[in-house]
From Swiss-Prot:
Designated name of the protein: Probable malate:quinone oxidoreductase
One GO MF term: L-malate dehydrogenase (quinone) activity
Coiled coil stretches, renumbered: none
Cofactor: FAD
Keywords: FAD, Flavoprotein, Oxidoreductase, Tricarboxylic acid cycle
Assigned protein family: Belongs to the MQO family.
Pfam families: Mqo
Catalysed reaction, written as an equation: (S)-malate + a quinone = a quinol + oxaloacetate
Pathway(s) per entry: Carbohydrate metabolism; tricarboxylic acid cycle; oxaloacetate from (S)-malate (quinone route): step 1/1
Superkingdom of source: Bacteria
EC number(s) recorded for this UniProt protein: 1.1.5.4
Species for this entry: Bacillus thuringiensis (strain Al Hakam)
GO terms for biological process, alphabetical: tricarboxylic acid cycle
């Protein structure tokens, strides 16, 4: 056991996509800073960032219907869709910068062009999708989107989904070829390989046990070396907690006022994966449906072509599960351990408010394989039970907090940065859209935690991410130029089309 304090400039907790992104930004902006990373598992990108633990969608609101809501007058609010798309463009630009600068190589190993499609059934839903298409088509970020309710066109676009369909219920789809499939596990590992060449100290099998403030204003991180059993103490001027579902318990240990009155509710995801390669080859798109009435946003069903280990795969889901663990590799005591005197009322209020979610989770947990197959057959009528297995994806901890709009114990479905008033520590909480917006979220961390440096750093940030601080919606020519140049660098252009 060692009580010796080891000093550094920056400590990143968790070797996932968020820490990888923040570390990469900091090494470009402040190369002289010493950075240490602590990860409980044996390698990078093994929890939420792992390719089997998330949907791998480059979330840019091209097909996700929950980002466009219908107003009472029937018009479509696209503001959230535009925001998510703008944020994904920042990620795309940063990845292209890293590839162009030869800091990472072989972009085809982490990003592939893939059509993004929305699919709906029923007259009312068809009308909604058409209105959505018309609203989005006016925005330059969504150029190239097509709409069809013609069965012959749908058969061309979606052969696997349309084959064997007997219902006469009207159907419609939108299709845009500029979507992507992103392997965030592969990208995370690439970024940490790059960071290692920049003398970032990567400590795997090191579990962070506690975080506390020292008398001189630094943060002391207590670390358990799992291999040796030793306890280490490291101090830093700045700490980022990017431990996925494990971030909330660590944030609570800091004792900062901003960590109070926040709770977390874990939801696990399950996907069905096709083991018949002949079926896999018949589908080439990410196809998102519409969540059933009363179901939470996380339940939007989608049938996805994926590229994992350079092999084409086909997944359907998500189905929800319940586990009290905050991480896939966590403890069954995580949920109860996160209940504190300062958040117990917030948690109880959420329990009362979210009876619908509780009921939904119970129903999902009770589903048999055949019941899941019935849901899959709404997408693929001819799906055979023997062709599909279930895989358990990652844990997501949905944030519960008190808000002005929602009142006490309101469940949050986004991604949120919580930071100390002095900017010395920050944590990332929440789930979707998550990894896709990693660059936007980590820029937010920089803005919140290093405000005095932002003027000095702005030039370099704009070199890496040219649309930083600029609305691409209001600058369509810039969007066109950046979309073309980043597509060329990332190897996306030959298969995606963006129309002028």
């Amino acid at each position: 056991m060692s009580n010796m304090q080891q000093k550094t400039d920056v400590i990143l907790i968790g070797a996932g996509i968020m820490s990888a992104t923040l570390g990469s930004l900091l090494k470009e902006l402040a190369p002289e800073w010493e950075i240490k990373v602590f990860e409980k598992l044996a390698s990078a990108g093994e929890e939420s960032s792992n390719e089997w633990n998330n949907a791998g969608t480059g979330h840019s609101a091209l097909c996700e219907l929950n980002y466009t809501s219908e107003k009472s007058d029937g018009s479509i609010d696209i503001s959230k869709a535009v925001k998510v798309n703008e944020q994904f463009q920042l990620s795309r630009q940063f990845w292209a910068y890293l590839v162009k600068s030869k800091l990472i190589r072989n972009p085809q190993d982490f990003i592939m062009p893939l059509p993004h499609m929305s699919l709906v059934q029923g007259e009312k839903n068809v009308e909604f999708l058409k209105n959505r298409f018309e609203a989005l088509s006016k925005n330059p970020l969504f150029q190239g989107m097509e709409f069809s309710d013609a069965p012959e066109t749908l058969k061309k676009w979606l052969p696997l989904i349309m084959e064997g369909r007997t219902s006469n219920e009207p159907m419609a789809a939108t299709k845009i070829d500029s979507g992507t499939d992103v392997n965030f596990g592969a990208l995370t590992r690439m970024l940490f390989d790059y960071l290692q060449t920049k003398n970032v100290e990567l400590n795997y099998k090191h579990s962070v046990e506690n975080i506390k403030r020292t008398k001189n204003g630094l943060w002391e991180v207590k670390v358990h070396d799992i291999n040796s059993g030793k306890i280490e103490h490291h101090t830093a001027k700045f700490v980022f907690i990017g431990g996925g579902g494990g971030s909330l318990p660590l944030l609570q240990k800091t004792g900062i006022p901003e960590s109070k009155h926040i709770g977390g509710f874990p939801v696990s995801g399950l996907f069905m994966v096709c083991k018949n390669q002949k079926v896999v080859e018949q589908h080439h798109a990410k196809v998102y449906g519409k969540a059933k009435v009363g179901a939470p946003p996380m339940s939007v069903p989608h049938l996805d072509t994926r590229y994992i280990d350079n092999k084409k795969a086909l997944l359907f889901g998500p189905f929800a599960g319940f586990s009290p663990k905050f991480l896939k590799t966590g403890s069954n005591l995580d949920l109860i351990g996160s209940v504190k005197p300062n958040n117990v009322l917030t948690m109880l209020a959420a329990g009362v408010k979210e009876m619908g979610l509780t009921k939904y989770l119970i129903q999902q947990v009770m589903l048999s394989h055949e019941k899941r197959m019935e849901e899959l057959r709404e997408f693929i009528p001819n799906a055979k039970s023997e062709d599909w297995d279930i895989v358990v994806a990652g844990q997501r901890v949905q944030v519960i907090k008190d808000t002005d709009a929602g009142g006490k114990g309101t469940l949050q479905f986004g991604t949120e940065v919580v930071s100390a008033a002095d900017g010395s520590i920050a944590a990332l909480l929440g789930a979707s859209p998550g990894a896709s917006t990693a660059v936007h979220v980590m820029l937010e961390v920089l803005e919140k935690c290093f405000p005095s440096r932002m003027v000095e750093w702005e030039g370099k940030i704009k070199e890496m991410i040219p649309s930083y601080g600029i609305s691409l919606t209001e600058n369509p020519r810039l969007f066109q130029d950046l979309h073309t140049s980043t597509g060329r660098t990332l190897g996306l252009n030959e298969k995606e089309t963006v129309h002028n």
